[in-house]
């Protein structure tokens, strides 16, 4: 599947590698959903639940599930235009589909768009590329929206604090993929509408070390995580940031991961 949401911290480039390390489970929970890179690249589970505190994220995926044709038609009729992009920051609509459309315009047409509400410049192609990739992606977006709509119809969509769901869904038959906003001292700026303080991260870590569910959590290398998760398996995966810089991500797992072709650099 193709991504329908350009989102800070997205895992689309490394999704296959993450999915290859997911163990067998009956219930799948992703409490910090974002663009949903892992869920949209893995096989369906018997029970699947996604969650995000960001109203725009939840509204978007609910609209894709329930009104995909209407949303796709709206996107298809909108040009890739600086004027269109700029206008989204002064227009506020209560209609869910209009809100989803505006969110997509901001995410796809803004350079390094941040969901924190900060307006960035309009993104365009000039020279040095064989074609206008940003424009091409925008005009393929309607078909990508239609492509994930059916997948979303079998998924429970939550909208509450992640820790509440982690506690509620905790069981040996569950698997959690956690991709929280990374510690602010490991990155250059705030990117999300709902950031996490160091105390928030400590509460998360103190919760998951006592869970019976199988858990995978992503982050940057940091003493706080290494101290709490020192008994967990780890993977180190290079990934490209929103700004184009390659940084090494750490994936901690409270289970023994199976070696794959990725571990040997073959894929």
Task: Show the residue positions of the predicted features.
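Long, positively charged, glycine-interspersed low-complexity recognition regions
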Residues: 194-267
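A residue-level signal for conserved active-site and pocket-lining positions in enzyme catalytic cores
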Residues: 34, 61, 104, 215, ...
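Short loop/helix-cap segments at secondary-structure boundaries that form the rim of catalytic
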Residues: 39-44, 168-171, 223-231
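SAM cofactor-binding core of SAM-dependent methyltransferases
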Residues: 20-90
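Short, polar loop motifs at secondary-structure junctions
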Residues: 33-37, 144, 219-223
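Structural beta-sheet core signal
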Residues: 50, 178, 215-217
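SAM-dependent nucleic-acid methyltransferase catalytic core
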Residues: 1-14, 21, 65-177, 181-189, ...
């Amino acid at each position: 599947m193709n991504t329908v949401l350009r989102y800070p911290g997205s895992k689309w480039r490394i999704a296959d590698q993450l999915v290859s390390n997911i163990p067998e489970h009956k219930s799948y929970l992703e409490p910090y959903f974002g663009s949903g890179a892992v869920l949209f690249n893995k096989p369906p589970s018997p029970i699947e639940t996604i969650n995000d505190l960001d109203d725009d994220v939840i509204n978007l995926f609910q609209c894709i599930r329930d009104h995909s044709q209407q949303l796709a038609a709206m996107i298809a009729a909108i040009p890739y235009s600086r004027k269109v992009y700029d206008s989204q920051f002064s227009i506020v609509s209560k209609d869910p589909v209009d809100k989803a459309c505006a969110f997509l315009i901001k995410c796809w047409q803004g350079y390094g768009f941040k969901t924190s509400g900060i307006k960035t410049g309009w993104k365009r192609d000039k020279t040095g590329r064989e074609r206008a990739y940003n424009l091409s992606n925008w005009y393929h977006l309607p078909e990508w929206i239609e492509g994930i709509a059916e997948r979303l119809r079998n998924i429970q969509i939550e909208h509450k604090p992640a820790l509440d769901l982690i506690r509620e869904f905790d069981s040996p038959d569950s698997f959690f993929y956690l991709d929280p906003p990374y510690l602010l001292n490991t990155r250059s700026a705030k990117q999300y509408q709902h950031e996490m303080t160091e105390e928030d991260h400590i509460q998360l870590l103190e919760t998951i070390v006592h869970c019976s569910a199988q858990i995978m959590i992503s982050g940057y290398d940091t003493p706080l995580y290494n101290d709490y998760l020192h008994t967990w398996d780890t993977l180190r995966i290079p990934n490209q940031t929103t700004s184009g810089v390659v940084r090494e991500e750490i994936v901690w797992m409270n289970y023994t991961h199976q070696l794959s072709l990725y571990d040997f650099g073959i894929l």
